[in-house]
Structures are given as C-alpha cells and as structure tokens.
C-alpha cells in the first residue's frame, strides 16, 4: 500500500495547526506541523512534503520569505497560503505569481482547504512526473 500524501502545516497559531492537522488526518493524509518557517527549514524530511499549508505572517521568517527560499533552493513543493489578512491584495498577488496554489482567508473553510490541497497534490504529481521523463 502506498504511503498517504504528506501535508506540512506551518503556522505560529497553535489552534490553526491543530485544526488543520485534525482535518487532514480525518481524510487520510499524513501531517506534520511546525510553529515557524525556521522550524520547517530545519526539518530533515522537508523534501518529503507533498503539500505545504503556510501562514503568510509569522514572527521571524514570513510565509512569503519561506516561499522565496524554497524557490531559490529549487524545492518544488506546492504551497497553499492561509492568512487572517486576506485583504492584502499585493501580498496575495505576489504569492500567486510566485506559484502558490491558493491563498485562503482565516477562518478557514474546510471545503475550500480540502479542494486546494487536492489541487496542490495534483500539481505536485505533475511536477514529479515531468522530472522522471
């Protein structure tokens, strides 16, 4: 049996991490959670992540900065941004231009998040397939 997709959640809000983790596990995904971008970058299995759910604003490195770092390091991890500041059109545009799969406002709609994760996983499989060819 194949391993379930691995979803990594990076958010400084513990309640968000716990609720997203619970939702993802309830539909059969493996989940890892991190309180900061730095914690995620120091994780030994970063490359195993199939989808990254990432808060935009966090103390230390922001979600946008983490996205830039991953791009510069040639990590092709599909990213879903989540934020309590959805009205920041400039940040939203930058995130999507840089390849984010979705940009969702908190409080999160479970349906919207699950749809975004499915889209991210489809995109990720396409990226992996093209590398193999």
Residue map of PLM features:
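C-terminal output helix
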Residues: 108-118
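Hydrophobic/aromatic residues positioned on beta-strands within the core alpha/beta folds
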Residues: 82-83
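Active-site beta3 strand of CheY-like receiver
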Residues: 47-53
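Two-component/phosphorelay signaling modules centered on CheY-like receiver
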Residues: 14-32, 98
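Receiver (REC) domain active-site loop signature in two-component systems and cognate sites
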Residues: 58
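Acidic catalytic/metal-coordinating carboxylates
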Residues: 35-36, 62-66
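The C-terminal output helix
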Residues: 118-133
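Alpha4 helix (beta4-alpha4-beta5 surface) of REC/receiver domains from two-component response regulators
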Residues: 65, 86-102
């Amino acid at each position: 049996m194949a391993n379930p997709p691995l979803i990594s959640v990076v958010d400084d809000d513990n309640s968000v991490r716990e609720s997203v983790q619970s939702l993802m596990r309830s539909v059969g995904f493996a989940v890892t959670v991190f309180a900061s971008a730095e914690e995620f970058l120091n994780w030994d299995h970063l490359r195993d992540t199939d989808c990254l759910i990432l808060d935009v604003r966090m103390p230390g490195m922001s979600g946008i900065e983490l996205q830039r770092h991953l791009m510069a390091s040639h990590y092709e991890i599909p990213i879903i941004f989540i934020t309590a500041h959805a009205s920041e059109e400039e940040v939203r545009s930058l995130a999507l231009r840089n390849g984010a799969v979705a940009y969702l406002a908190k409080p999160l709609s479970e349906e919207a998040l699950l749809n975004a994760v499915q889209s991210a996983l489809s995109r990720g499989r396409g990226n992996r397939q093209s590398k193999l060819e």
